[in-house]
């Protein structure tokens, strides 16, 4: 089932672990990075949008600093990340330039995705980069996060990015073949699971530990990441990054690794999240034309269609869209605060900059962040 979905998927998150970008922990393997760039270039030629979540900054920093073992102290890890992140970003930029592709570095913290305003900003930035045919390369901003609020590992970060931009598929590449019925290093009869639902209660007991001393995430974290990605409807494939041309072969529908299936499609999951899981902070009243546009045309909500703003909401918070009779017809994420919305309501989008002095978005609520009730 997922093989065909992977073939038809337009937006893919690819996560590569430290063991797949370093030379056994002794710094970045630029030849390997070039291989990932080449495969992603081929995926893009197939019409796919690809976001790369890459580990490797700490490992590269350790090599630069001459450290043989991964430090336990957070401040030392942050120092290694600060040293290594520059080399990681430059190495990827050089590799992708061989295929005439631009890259963009994005460093995220948990606060960026828990704050509604910063969540919306991060989402808009990544989607804009994809529209510009640029490859976003994402990592956790290790240099500033505290141990209590870190993502935990890049498996979890990749899943959250899948949630953020509604990716259809998350591909987690590791140094293991996939999910087995047991730890193959301990159980000779363990077999590779080709396909399983993320809601299967047995998958956590099947997950083993990490096989590398360089990274942080073991199979357990990959299963948890798959479950998190499934909340927004994304399927996950866990496969070995050692398989030749693994990304291209997966995109062509070849059965490699383990597919963990989400229980609902991306669009359905997104609509349920918008409708049921966000606290509404305010509302806007729409004129008849705007109401018709939302209900029948699948349009975004523009400021010109708003006749009244109620409540005190901020950018990125959920608001209700009411018709002139006061009935809620839609719900979505506001691109502007209540104060800003009041200033630009009843005005064409072309006047937003003149009124506010800047333009965040041309829509008050974008259709991708809107659900009809």
From Swiss-Prot:
**UniProt-listed SMART domains:** PUA (SM00359)
Name of the featured protein: Glutamate 5-kinase
- Write one Gene Ontology MF term: glutamate 5-kinase activity
Q: Example GO biological process term? A: L-proline biosynthetic process
Task: Locate the residues binding ATP.
Answer: 15, 174-175
Q: Does the keyword Cytoplasm apply?
A: yes
Keywords linked to the UniProt accession = Amino-acid biosynthesis, ATP-binding, Cytoplasm, Kinase, Nucleotide-binding, Proline biosynthesis, Transferase
Indicate the segments annotated as coiled coil, or none if absent.
Answer: none
């Amino acid at each position: 089932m997922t093989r065909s979905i992977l073939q038809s998927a337009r937006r893919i998150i690819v996560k590569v672990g430290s063991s797949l970008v370093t030379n056994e922990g002794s710094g970045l393997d630029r030849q390997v990075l070039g291989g990932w760039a080449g495969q992603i270039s081929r995926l893009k030629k197939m019409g796919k949008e690809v976001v790369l979540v890459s580990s490797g900054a700490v490992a590269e920093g350790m090599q630069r600093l001459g450290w043989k073992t991964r430090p336990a102290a957070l401040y030392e890890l942050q120092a290694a990340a600060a040293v290594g992140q520059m080399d990681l970003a430059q190495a990827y930029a050089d590799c992708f330039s061989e295929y005439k592709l631009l890259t963009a570095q994005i460093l995220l913290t948990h606060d960026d995705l828990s704050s509604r305003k910063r969540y919306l900003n991060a989402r808009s930035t990544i989607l804009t980069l994809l529209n510009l045919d640029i490859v976003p390369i994402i990592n956790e901003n290790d240099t500033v996060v505290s141990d209590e609020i870190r993502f935990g590992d890049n498996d979890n970060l990749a899943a959250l990015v899948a949630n953020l931009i509604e990716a259809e598929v998350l591909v987690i590449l590791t140094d293991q073949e996939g999910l087995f019925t047991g730890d193959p290093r301990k159980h000779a009869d363990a077999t590779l699971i080709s396909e399983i639902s993320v809601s299967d209660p047995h998958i956590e007991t099947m997950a083993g530990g990490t096989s590398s001393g360089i990274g942080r995430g073991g199979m357990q974290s990959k299963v948890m990441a798959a479950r998190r990605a499934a909340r927004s409807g994304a399927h996950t494939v866990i496969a070995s990054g050692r398989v030749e041309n693994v990304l291209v072969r997966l995109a062509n529908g070849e059965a490699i690794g383990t597919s963990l299936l989400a229980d609902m499609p991306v669009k359905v999951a997104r609509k349920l999240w918008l409708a049921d899981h966000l606290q509404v902070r305010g509302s806007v009243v729409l004129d008849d034309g705007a109401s018709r546009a939302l209900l029948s045309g699948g349009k975004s909500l523009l400021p010109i269609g708003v006749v009244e703003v109620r409540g005190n909401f901020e950018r990125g918070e959920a608001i209700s869209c009411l018709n002139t009779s006061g009935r809620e017809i839609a719900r979505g994420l506001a691109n502007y605060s209540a104060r800003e919305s009041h200033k630009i309501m009843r005005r064409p989008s072309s006047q937003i900059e003149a009124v506010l002095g800047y333009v965040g978005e041309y829509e008050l609520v974008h259709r991708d962040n809107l659900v009809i009730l």
